[in-house]
Amino acid sequence: MDRIRIVGGAQLNGTIPISGAKNAALPLMIAALLSDETLILDNVPRLADVAQLQRILGNHGVDILSAGKRPGDHEYQGQTLHISAKNIIDTTAPYELVSKMRASFWVIAPLLARMHVAKVSLPGGCAIGTRPVDLLIMALEKLGASITIDGGYVVASCPGGLKGAEIEFPKVTVSGTHVALMAATLAKGTTFIGNAACEPEIVDVADCLNKMGAKILGAGTPRITVEGVAKLHGARHTVLPDRIETGTYAMAVAMTGGDVQLSGARPELLQSALDVLTEAGATITVNNDGIRVARNGAGINPVTVTTAPFPGFPTDLQAQLMALMTRAKGDSHITETIFENRFMHVQELARFGARIQLDGETATINGVEKLRGAPVMATDLRASVSLVIAALAAEGETMVNRIYHLDRGFERLEEKLSACGATIERISG
């Protein structure tokens, strides 16, 4: 099993190109199931999760051609995918595929909308709390689907097709909004999605669906209106830049000191995180090429943050911020409101010498002067990169184990950090 070795202490200086957003690329790939024409997606990151979803879509009979990889390119490099779901041969998504990635459950929506039947295994992915699919099922039932759960599978059908409906989510749900949005595009009549997630990735998917002929209004607001159409056609769409990757590298620079240009980043996608970084002592400059992040000389200021749905501080940057705050001059407080059990990185950060106390949903971080390298183990995608951030600033050597979590969500991480002066290498086996 691969590991990453990091020797801390070096500042980061240079340029890091920001990849396409994983959290947009996955639902965009799934949306290709809605049409029998080809969907072309540019700026798709080369990630383990993307490769896994390609296998899942292939199981349904989807043809995917990857272009844009030249001889000598790294395995994980942005790509263009030509996705054709002209001939869907199977409407079952089996356990052995879906169990490896939670987002793959979303195939239930386009399969049901277009084929009127779907059988999808209950999902897998990061082990963060329960993350139930109840709200997704509720949305599909509102649209007229008949759903049962049998032997670990969700079995859904709508012989006459889906019908427009009023869907009101009891709480904001990104997954539920994606599923409702995709299903409603081919439903007969108009669908209203209330308490919808406002994340930029939702907007990106809606923009792509509209290019394919959907009639969606209000994406990015709490109320989305979808007027169903009979058919979607092919289109070409560029995946938006990854705001979580942007925030992660920005926090790494704030942690180590230095000056890095995050090329291609869009500040409006993570303004709340940039505001927190400014409060923590980083200098953020927006320019024509993206965002420049610097911290030279000054220490790290403590902050108090509560995670919230967009435009609030993203839960997917909570672990990275906690790593940064381990070196702050004072006590910081981070409250997690989105997912339960999302503090699994705390015990691993403690191995560096971090001082963190948990009280329910709130972590109090007592900043320390120095962190020391240690062998650590990744527990999930975002937690794993928080260990990398801590290791970059720690004295001595750190070995990060179980890095398959990193490969699920960060494209060419070692290369990007190494190019900016970090001592970091992947050790195979």
Curated annotation (Swiss-Prot):
Keywords: Cell cycle, Cell division, Cell shape, Cell wall biogenesis/degradation, Cytoplasm, Peptidoglycan synthesis, Pyruvate, Transferase. Its main location: cytoplasm. It is an enzyme of class 2 (transferase). It is found in: Cytoplasm. Phosphoenolpyruvate binds at residues 22-23. The keyword Repeat does not apply. This is UDP-N-acetylglucosamine 1-carboxyvinyltransferase. It catalyses: phosphoenolpyruvate + UDP-N-acetyl-alpha-D-glucosamine = UDP-N-acetyl-3-O-(1-carboxyvinyl)-alpha-D-glucosamine + phosphate. UDP-N-acetyl-alpha-D-glucosamine binds at residues 102, 131-135, 316, 338. InterPro entries: Enolpyruvate_Tfrase_dom (IPR001986), Enolpyruvate_Tfrase_sf (IPR036968), MurA_subfamily (IPR050068), RNA3'P_cycl/enolpyr_Trfase_a/b (IPR013792), UDP_GlcNAc_COvinyl_MurA (IPR005750). HAMAP family: MurA. It comes from the Bacteria. The modification 2-(S-cysteinyl)pyruvic acid O-phosphothioketal is found at residue 126. Cell wall formation. Adds enolpyruvyl to UDP-N-acetylglucosamine. GO terms for molecular function: UDP-N-acetylglucosamine 1-carboxyvinyltransferase activity.
